[in-house]
Amino acid sequence: MLEFVEKLTLYPWLLVRKDVTALQDAGFPDPTILHIVLGCAHFNYLNRMADGIGIRFEYQTEIPEVAQRRSDSGSPGPASLDPTVRESESSGLAWIGFQESNNVVAETDGPLNLYCVMSANPAARDLAREWRSYQLKGTTQLEGRLRAQLGLYISGLNHCEYSAYWLNKILKGLSESDSLCERLASGEPPPGLRSREQSLFTHARRLTYEPASTKEEHIQQLRRSGFNDQGILQLTMLCSYFSFENRVALALGVPIERET
């Protein structure tokens, strides 16, 4: 289990069906595996929130800071970023069993399979659905199109084809170009960004790959780019949410819905 959690935390795109099968063979029932995945993904969300806005201990502590594991480029190396690793397992049923819910089917205009695979934990499923909707609603500091672009970019960095599929649909509905969507889905920021938008995509990449490397100077850069603290909080929540969603989809092998 610890090996599974470590991989889900550090390299979620490398998870394959046999990782889940190993948990099942070790005696973990599917609802427990779901609980493990949700817990790990949730703490990845919380870690990014804490690191992204500089939350520190409220009291004196002797706990040492954890040294950062970095490659020479400051991000995961090419081998760990190979998007073809999961290609052979990109179709079929999710890696754990689940029961489809008529309520979910009736009420969902979005990532149905993501919610169905969470059906063993209805409270978490319903909260995830509401939280996703909240994160994609535009605000003064982060309008809806930009939020979807950032979500697709983060999903591209994590090689999460499932989340990328749905974010791509949102952007296509906003008449976004195919070329830009393809670029974002491959983990590349839009070309020719102004400094304001560039600071957003740079920070999103940092929170995706190395959230603990965030420093106050990075927050100051966002402020200089025109974001107030509420906007920075919104950006941090958005990046943290897609860290959660990507990990749930990747860890459970959630398949893309078949269009009829």
PLM regions: where:
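Hydrophobic alpha-helical segments
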Residues: 1-260
